[in-house]
Amino acid sequence: MALRFEVGAASQSGGRRGALHLPHGVVQTPFFMPVGTAATVKAVPQDTLEQIGADGAGAEMILANTYHLYLRPGHELIRRMGGVHRFMSWNRPMLTDSGGFQVFSLAKLRKVTPDGVEFRSHLDGSSHFFSPEHSMEVQIALGADVMMAFDECVETPATWERTRDSMGLTHAWAARSKQYFEAHKNEVPWASEQVGESASQRVSDGSLSNRAKFEGKTQSLFGIVQGGMYPDLRRESAERLIEMDFDGYAIGGLAVGEPPEVTREMIARTLEILPRDRPRYVMGVGYPDQIAEYARMGVDMMDCVLPTRAARHGLLFRSAEPGERQAMEDAIGEEQSGEERLGERWTGDSDATPSAIRMNIKRVEYAEDQRPIDPTCACPVCRRYTRAYLRHLFMAREPLGATLNSIHNLAFYLDIMKRVRGELVAANCV
């Protein structure tokens, strides 16, 4: 049995509250996934990930990257360890991408054919080949609860003709991905529970070593809607993938440099077509206000490296206070001058009222600031540490700074999704 998706409360704008049942647990939707590229959410230990957020529930699901784990330490090693959950001692659901986006981002280091993609490792220049079948083989070895069909992410901008051809390749690869998955889905490492128990398996409730937990369960496979920035191609791609009957559907190829209003339009057009009884996943987005907006539109799943990447560069998200909102609105359209005057940057679209601010902890104005990052945030960082201390850690290049910054930003994102879930329940009760 693959995933089971329950849809509960829904709003007039299309947002819905639900629950995604997966082999390693139940995830409340809509939700945001922290990105654990190389089987680690950078700078944040797993036990901390399980507890961050206002309610202490932590991240219910995280993402790992197939391309990076294939190159190092290798999918066969991870298979021998019992899968990526056991390898990294994570007892909650996981998703792996197909590796396609990373391969195609190599540009000069890859060659695309109908069979797949030949590419050179960014680590040592060695030559490799990813086909849909090989991507599935690697993802089955990793053993995440959800895996993605192999796809081509077209460059931006691209002509309609180039985008159509790329989309056709994605559809052909999706069919091949599904065919291989259906034939080999019982080969997932945790299906047999043949790996001996180790310290990394003895998690708090011991459930990773419980053979009955996974009996009759398999991974789930999502198809990825492409079509660039062309609504007609997006529709065609969604309809073609629906015919293939995937467990869920992702909207890919967005947040690659296009204006925010185009991103929103492509998501809205695609959501109109995708089936309501399957989870809907927008890949690689976005800023705090954007993930809240997309969840209210009916997106169930999102991921992005932004909260942790920004944190490592000293950029922290916080709630805008009432007076600041007006000041930020006044600065909209003034571009850099407005940002310099305020020392911060709002994170919404150009026609929206900002509710989240991205602050630069490196600024000298925080050197003696004894306030927390966000007085309204209940994360452990905001409960204990001052802006002055966090600035000191960053300027001194202390590793703890990256950890604390990342914990706060992730908690900020997870709390946004918790609030949206509450809004959807409340809207359904009115």
Labelled PLM ranges:
Residues W90, L95, G100-A107, T113-D124, ...:
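Active-site pocket-lining/capping segments in soluble small-molecule metabolic enzymes
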Residues M1-E187, V364:
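Non-catalytic, usually N-terminal nucleic-acid engagement modules in DNA/RNA processing proteins
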Residues M1-H21, V27-P34, A43, D151-P157, ...:
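C-terminal extensions of enzymes
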Residues G25, I62, D97, Q139, ...:
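Conserved, mostly hydrophobic/aromatic
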Residues H184, G216-F222, Q226-D330, G343-I373:
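Glycine-rich phosphate/ribose-binding loops and adjacent secondary-structure elements
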